[in-house]
Amino acid sequence: QIKFWGAAYGSFLRPCVPLFVMITGALLLPLKDDTSVFYKKRISRVFWPFLIWSVLYNLFPWITGLLGLSPEVILDFFPYSGEEVARQSLGISLRYIAEIPLNFSIVDVHMWYIYLLIGLYLYLPIFSAWVEKASEKAKLWFLLAWGVSTLLPYYYQFVSPYVWGGCSWNSFNMLYYFAGFNGYLLLGHYLRNHDWSLNKILL
């Protein structure tokens, strides 16, 4: 039952991240600030709340033990956390905290999005330089290649796990560099800045 409702809620909310990335592209591309100013303003605004909340989430299992609460409390919040978290060990919590620069832990899985967001912010000044100079046709070609890349997981699932140069020792196939959330950035920018008037569309 947990898996069913988790899948139901997840499917309903799944579009939120791509939509947010599209809004980011619509509002920020092309960048108006200098690269150093942009990094200081955007990344610092995200980094410190992310770090504080990640630490608190990873300390949560240990804090429940400190308060004398049952490990079942942890499973109520994090059903997939497993036996390691249920030990309520400070050592395990500290190990999770030490691994924050590398990845999220089993108790702060939802923080995956912040790693994505920081990566997009690091990438934006470089992408912005291209967006500012690129023609509409070039942007449409990028979006077409990116759109095809979004269909590849279905190909992997139902046809073959490898295509266009991909194999067991090379995951960088032909459209690899068009794939990912950068397409949502450009799509948001394009939808906002394209002339959608009826006359323009008919022409």
Residue ranges and their predicted role:
Residues 1-4, 161-170:
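Membrane-interface interhelical loops and short amphipathic "cap" helices
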Residues 43:
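Active-site helix-to-loop segments that bind/position phosphate- or nucleotide-bearing substrates
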Residues 68-70, 203:
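N-terminal low-complexity, intrinsically disordered segments
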